[in-house]
Amino acid sequence: MKFRIYRYDPEKDAKPRFQEYDIALDPHDRMLLDALIRLKVVDDSLAFRRSCREGVCGSDAMNINGRNGLACITNLKTLKEPVELRPLPGLPVVRDLIVDMSQFFKQYHSIKPYLVNDEPPPERERLQSPEERESLDGLYECILCACCSTACPSFWWNPDKFVGPAGLLNAYRFIADSRDRDLNARLDSLEDPYRLFRCHSIMNCVDVCPKGLNPTVAIGTIKTMMIKRAV
């Protein structure tokens, strides 16, 4: 199978380049990550992240034939050759297919991704009704792979100002949580021309999410809440 892979080491290379590979795959190699691991045996200088191999950790997110995705759940049979692999767009390249996720996680942490509740804790846990719990479906499953945010032009242009689809999806996950008591502060922190409203609903984030989530709906709901409290 033929591959064309982005190669760049900022400490050694003057500019990025593409390197071509043609390797024979084992019949058991079904996913793109399997092929990358086999390529790593052939060329141990190739750098990429991976961990769980199950689409849970989000470590092996990359741009695959022009579309962001996870290597571990991308079936080789679905890919046209040569398979072109690039690092996630919009983030600094550390080396080859590895990007610096610092800005992505800075925006994520800025939305306070945890429950805020200063009420005296109950003897047991803070309970939710089945309906309240169900309202979090489609929100809590985010694995922070950054496929969505790095597919978003607004995040490319303003990574230091726009929270991005992943961060805003998680912001709504806590806004929608019946156990949280920080609603007004959460909305106040997003009341900004850039942090929330740079989303133009082009839905690239929805198209690439490996978990099938819909950040655009979550972002739209936050915008609606902003408008309602302003009138």
Where are these regions (language model features)?
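Eukaryote-biased recognition of intrinsically disordered, low-complexity regulatory segments
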Residues: 1-21
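Short, contiguous acidic and Ser/Thr-rich linear segments
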Residues: 19-30
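Short strand-turn-strand beta-turns centered on an Asx-Gly dipeptide
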Residues: 24, 63-67
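Ferredoxin-type iron-sulfur electron-transfer modules in oxidoreductases and energy-metabolism complexes
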Residues: 30-43, 86-231
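Active-site phosphate-binding and catalytic loops of NTP-dependent enzymes
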Residues: 43-49
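Short, structured protein-protein interaction patches enriched in aromatics and acidic/basic residues
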Residues: 52-61
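A generic structural motif
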Residues: 75-76
